[in-house]
């Protein structure tokens, strides 16, 4: 995972971000420096509890002396580095990336911040055509169990789910990228149905998905019936009681019923990752 060094660092580096001097510990990334400077740098494939994979290119910034834009989520800071996060070149790149993504998949259930970024950068995905024309996108949702749904019409191939299923959390490797080019997609081994795969239903893939391609079955059903209302939900933090690890749970409650369970990514015990019991073992608590 990409972690900023803690404790007393051996070396502090000083760089300039949008004209402001920022001091960060050696080993920090440009994104760390941007956030320390209070800048809202968009990210899609990055998460604080996952290893950067550099695929979305939304977080790119301009570094003085570099011919190409660089991904801030993984580029380590160097002493004296001069970074521009809001230049015309950066804004154009981010606008185009967001347009291409939003024109290729359905984004109506994506995280709210994605819509905010699109408005901020003036993205107009409609000028790219209808996303339903893409063969790999126009596919029905995979409802294969009672826990969660895979709706790949909304998948942007950020690979967060693959990372969470693999080295960064669960080490199950039940899913991976299959195919190439326009045929690339997330798949189980040999494209078997999820209950027949190596999946252990920890749900960590759901916890990191930014576009709603992976959702709780409860949320999916409530959206179909028009009863899902995120604004009306109350979130209560508690501690999972199934074992002695002490994982923190955020219970999302609507109409006095638990509709889904998440975990804070910045919690020191599990970094937001849970097992099947913590993520889905709450049906007994329903009124």
Q: How should these model regions be labeled?
A:
Residues 13, 20-79, 93:
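N-terminal cofactor/phosphate-binding cores enriched in small/glycine residues
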Residues 252-287:
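Cofactor-/ligand-binding subdomain signature composed of acidic, glycine-rich
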